[in-house]
Structures are given as C-alpha cells and as structure tokens.
Amino acid sequence: MKKILFVAMQNSPHTIRWILQAQSEEWEVHLFPISQYPLHPDMPSWVKVHHPWKIARASFGSGFLTSPIVTGNILLAYLSSLFNFRQRIPILSSLMLFLVDSFRSSLGVAGNTSPIAYGPFVLSQLIKNLKPDLIQSLEFQHAGYCVYAARGLIDAKLFPKWMGTVWGSDILYYRNIPNHLVQIKQLLSSLDIFSCECKRDIDFARELGFTGVFSPVMPDAGSVDISNLKQWRDLIVPSKRRIILIRGYQSFSGRALTALDALEICQERLHGYRILVYSASNEVKQRVKELSLSTSIDIHILSHITPYAMLRLFARARLFIGISVSDGISRSMIEAMAMGAFPIQTDTSCCEEWIIDGVNGYSVPVDDIEVISEKIQSALANNAMVDNASRMNLALIDERLNNETLTRRALEFYRASLGLC
C-alpha cells in the first residue's frame, strides 16, 4: 500500500483539517511531529504518529522516558547511541519538555532550529525505514526546513516525492529576510510539488525558482460546514447585530494595536456596540484596559474561548476586523464571512481573492489608521451593504469551501501524485 508521510505541527488544528482531507483506503497516512508537544486532541486514530519515544505516566504522577526497540519503523538508533538508555529511565514529568528542548539541531542557513529528537537526522532515519511514496511538509519555516535538511542526509535517488505546503506568511513575509530568502529558494528548488492557499504564492514560487508541479489552490485550514452553522448564523440579521470582533494578535505579523487605534478615532460612532478582542497579546490586553478606562468604548478581552463558541460569536457580530502585515487566507476572516459578519481585513493577506472591496467586505492598508477608521464607520452606517455582503459571502464560502468539493479535489490530486490514476 502507498504511504504518505506528513511532517507538520502536530498540535495545530490546521494540520488536523488538512490530514482529514487525505483519508483514503488507498494509502496509509503517517505523521512525523516537529516538536515534543502533545498531539492535537482531534488527531485521527488512523494516522500513525512517529514519536522518537513514548511517554507513559505512572500512577503516582511521575513519568517515564521509554526507549523503543530500534526496528525498521522506529527512530531512536541515534538517540539511543547518544544517551545509552535501556528500557526505562524515570524522569520528572515537569522536566520532560525542558530536557527534550535543550538539545537542538540546525535547520539550515536561516538559523531556525528544532529539538534534536524531532530534527533532520531522526526524520532521515524514518524516511529510510518507512520508505514513504510522498512526503508533505505543512508549513515552510519549521516543517519544510526540517525536510530539506533531512533530504541532505539521504541519497537523492532514494528520496521520495516531496510536496511543500505554504502557510500564511511563509513566503510573503520571510522572503524579505536575507537568510530566509536563501533557504526558501533552496527549498523551492528541491520540491516536486508546490501547494498553497493563495494564488499570489504561485507567482512568488515561480519568481524564486520553483519549476515543478502546482497542486490545486486550497485553504490550509480546510473546509467550512455551512449546513451545521446555519442554525446559529440566521438567528440575527447582520445589520441588527451589536458586536464587533477584533483578532488580537500583536506579533511579527499581527497588528491588533492598529485596529484599536482606529476604533479610538471613531469612538463616538461605537455607542451601543460591544467590542470583543480575542487571542489578545499582552500589549493588546493593556491597550484594551486603557481604552476601557479612558474612553466611552465598551471593550472587553475574550479569554479561553472554544472554536465552536467563537463561531457562535461570529454569528452575533456585525463586523470582524483583522489587521496584519502578512497573512494567507485568514481562517478568522473565512469564519466571519461564513457566519454573516462583515470582514475588514488588511490587503497584506490574500483577502482580495475573496473580497470585492466595498461589496462583501473591505480590504484596508495595514498602516493607515484613518482609512481603517473610515471603513469601520462606513460598515456601521450602511445596513444594506452589510446584509447583502452576508448573503454573498455565504454563497461564496459554500461554493469554495464545502467539504465534499475540497475533499474530492484533494483525493484526486493525491491519487495523481501517488500514480494511482
């Protein structure tokens, strides 16, 4: 039977959604995690996960670092030789992550590293023993770089077909950093298949030297099940909703503080609306506190909200605001559109592949607070635009992101890549 080996962030919901699209009786699905952290709770049981060791817990709360028998499908010949451990070495559970993370491998000229136990050498041993027919790395700067480094440890004639999948800012942002640009070019020149969620990344890949096969453009975060969401979506007409949701990332790419500054400018127009900020960084939390004390804005931080609760909030929101210097298809924007919230998203994502500016959303510059504020006020004033956008976006999401369509396209491409059709 054919084998697909995913190299990916094992705790990411994006990984889960992608792998679910690859389920088939025609091949086995394997996963090499890129770190020592736990699997996402929704990881399918039919995925064979290749950890370099297994962690077992004793009844009294301590843990054990268990050395597997080194066979054709287990990875630890290297670590066994380093640490010379036998069957079980007791170790405090609280120290496990620290110890594993302390020994790191280089992933190349960009300067990224990985835990040595989940690094290129161990991955190369798995590839040699498992002999997958296709490797798919989900994301470039960790998973992709790790596969590229492992590739250098294996005879090129024995290395399997490799599909590299771009996430979010993998090329758009990192191509502006010299060392990353070098490594992105190296990676692209080694790929057989390039996978992305934004059409713009196809052009970037060509410009940077990719000459292989392009997979169908598909969202990294998977499908949206409209049929199960309508029960929440249709409870309140968008123009009657009184919640504004803001994605609270302030990071190398997130710019939630810019969104908050734009709200402060139009605070008089926000009377009667509640502003909710989710996934807030520490500086964003501080800024929200300042706005709450110094202005009339009714603004709050959302903490520890589940994905389903988030969807229900989108169904009660009039506006969604996502500001970032770099992104792919924002999952938050997609979910907002699916639930009827009017999206205001920066043009540094590929939102323009989804939004007709001023029709079913607004595409705004990341650094122009005045423009962002004007678009917020416009979306609050124009009830007809918001309601019409809701209907248009529902049809758009259902057309592009329904599970049946995406799964069929994914399976057809996997079959072709594995030589099954």
Language model features: what each stretch is:
Residues 348-358, 362-363:
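Short acidic/histidine- and often glycine-rich active-site loop of Leloir-type glycosyltransferases
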Residues 312-317:
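Short alpha-helical donor nucleotide-sugar binding micro-motif in glycosyltransferases
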Residues 341-345:
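Short hydrophobic beta-strand element within catalytic cores of glycosyltransferases
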Residues 164-167, 189-232, 238-239:
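Donor nucleotide-sugar binding/catalytic pocket of nucleotide-sugar-dependent glycosyltransferases
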Residues 195, 222, 233-267, 276-278:
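Conserved donor-binding/catalytic core segment of Leloir-type glycosyltransferases
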Residues 371, 378, 385-400, 406-412, ...:
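A short, well-ordered alpha-helix in the C-terminal region of glycosyltransferases
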Residues 325:
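Aromatic "clamp/platform" in nucleotide-sugar-dependent glycosyltransferases that forms part
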Residues 286-305:
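Nucleotide-activated donor-binding/catalytic signature segment of Leloir-type glycosyltransferases, i.e.
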